[in-house]
């Protein structure tokens, strides 16, 4: 299970060439996050966990840091977190890095962040619903969770042709955004 995914994320901690698809996705994500910042007055950001879909781990909140937000990044893998801290150092951007493994109990008080968010990591967690409830608890304004569209051609290619083992280490039912929304609403969002 972990070996395939481990190889993928480790590669991008030193090879920043994500390919055109991921670069385009990052531009769209950055625009979306900056629009959220503007619309909701976001100044403090929590991204937990920092590992989600392919590409360079831990850089999803870079645009927010560049726009002056205080960013906190949480991950359960100490080696990955250290590498992400190095990457942020290369970018000369400040951030707070927290090693924490209990996604059902984040080490922050209620309403600690303007934005608590996650980029496609739910299906790697043993209890995704617990993390979603925690994101609601620690956010005072906005919770944003993105998951891949299971009907999108790239996803289907990955699942059935390019990386058939993917479903062995990813819990696909958490890519159902309706399911995610129901948990968030049940937590009071």
Residue positions per predicted region:
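N-terminal, positively charged/glycine-rich alpha-helical extensions of SAM-dependent methyltransferases
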Residues: 1-18
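A short SAM/SAH-binding and catalytic strip from SAM-dependent methyltransferases
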Residues: 114-127
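Short alpha-helix
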Residues: 169-189
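A short glycine-rich, Lys/Arg-flanked "PGG" loop and its adjoining helix->strand segment in the class I
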Residues: 129-144
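Conserved class I S-adenosyl-L-methionine
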Residues: 141-174
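A short acidic, Gly/Pro-enriched loop at the edge of an enzyme's catalytic core
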Residues: 104-115
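Conserved alpha-helix/loop element of class I SAM-dependent methyltransferases that forms part
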Residues: 21-48, 59-63
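Class I SAM-dependent methyltransferase SAM/SAH-binding core
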Residues: 44-105
């Amino acid at each position: 299970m972990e070996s395939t995914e481990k190889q993928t994320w480790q590669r991008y901690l030193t090879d920043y060439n994500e390919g055109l698809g991921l670069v385009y996705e990052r531009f769209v994500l950055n625009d979306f996050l900056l629009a959220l910042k503007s619309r909701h007055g976001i100044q403090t950001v929590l991204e937990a966990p920092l590992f989600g879909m392919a590409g360079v781990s831990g850089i999803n909140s870079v645009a927010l840091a560049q726009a002056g937000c205080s960013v906190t990044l949480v991950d359960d893998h100490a080696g990955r977190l250290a590498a992400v801290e190095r990457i942020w150092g290369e970018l000369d951007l400040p951030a707070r890095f927290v090693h924490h493994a209990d996604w059902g109990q984040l080490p922050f008080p209620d309403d600690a962040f303007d934005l608590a968010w996650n980029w496609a990591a739910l299906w790697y967690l043993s209890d995704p619903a617990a993390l979603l409830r925690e994101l609601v608890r620690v956010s005072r304004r906005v919770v944003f969770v993105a998951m891949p569209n299971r009907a999108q051609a790239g996803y289907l290619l990955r699942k059935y042709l390019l990386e058939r083992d993917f479903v062995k280490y990813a819990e696909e039912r958490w890519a159902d955004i309706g399911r995610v929304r129901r948990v968030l609403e049940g937590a009071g969002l």
